[in-house]
Amino acid sequence: MQAGVIAVQGDVAEHAAAVENAAAAHGEPAEVVEVRDAGIVPDCDVLLMPGGESTTISRLIRREGIDEEIREHVASGKPVLATCAGLIVCSRDAKDDRVDALGLVNVSVDRNAFGRQKDSFEAKIPMTGLDEPFHAVFIRAPLIDDVGEGVEVLATVDGRPVAVRDGPVVATAFHPELTDDSRIHDLAFFPEQEVVA
């Protein structure tokens, strides 16, 4: 399995380790490639859109021509995991003119709605598709404030969606790569198999 991490900005190394662990659990080797330029995404089986700064990520993927390749990847049914800023970039509406949302996940989001850096928090959250709660790390997390047709809510915190699936895209408001638990990557890239802790 070739996994591309959109590496224009954000948590690259952590996602690489998590996808390697998820693939290994299924007896499948993973080659992780960093995507900084156009021409790499078409060769990838799965994509990771990491956290970071959504305005920067949006601008750089558009400038490099990666945005259209990501859209084509999803249109072909190939999996994507988008986390935190990745969720914002992949949303239908980022409610920020500086973010050119890709429209891959039929949700609207409010950037940093869970608060500033000092308001970061961690929570054990039950999640559809996982046998045990997931330890989620929220850092300047976005809020999914509108869920459109065709979107499955996978997890909530205080009644607010924090993880969703829209076709081949799993998107989270939190950072699963900042834990030693690769089950979210597993859920995104091996959806047909049971995910156990």
Swiss-Prot record:
EC numbers: 4.3.3.6, 3.5.1.2
GO CC entries: cytosol; glutaminase complex
Keyword line: Glutamine amidotransferase, Hydrolase, Lyase, Pyridoxal phosphate
Recorded coiled-coil stretches: none
Positions of L-glutamine binding: G52, E53, S54, R111, I139, R140
Superkingdom as given in the UniProt entry: Archaea
Matches recorded under PROSITE patterns: PDXT_SNO_2 (PS51130)
GO molecular-function terms, A-Z: glutaminase activity; pyridoxal 5'-phosphate synthase (glutamine hydrolysing) activity
Pathway: Cofactor biosynthesis; pyridoxal 5'-phosphate biosynthesis
Gene Ontology terms: biological process: glutamine catabolic process; pyridoxal phosphate biosynthetic process; pyridoxine metabolic process
Pfam families: SNO
Catalyzed chemical reaction(s): aldehydo-D-ribose 5-phosphate + D-glyceraldehyde 3-phosphate + L-glutamine = pyridoxal 5'-phosphate + L-glutamate + phosphate + 3 H2O + H(+); L-glutamine + H2O = L-glutamate + NH4(+)
Record keyword Cytoplasm present: no
Active site: C84, H175, E177
Annotated function: Catalyzes the hydrolysis of glutamine to glutamate and ammonia as part of the biosynthesis of pyridoxal 5'-phosphate. The resulting ammonia molecule is channeled to the active site of PdxS.
Known partners and oligomeric status: In the presence of PdxS, forms a dodecamer of heterodimers. Only shows activity in the heterodimer.
Family: Belongs to the glutaminase PdxT/SNO family.
NCBIfam families, per database record: PLP_synth_Pdx2
Protein name (Swiss-Prot/TrEMBL): Pyridoxal 5'-phosphate synthase subunit PdxT
Gene behind the chain: pdxT
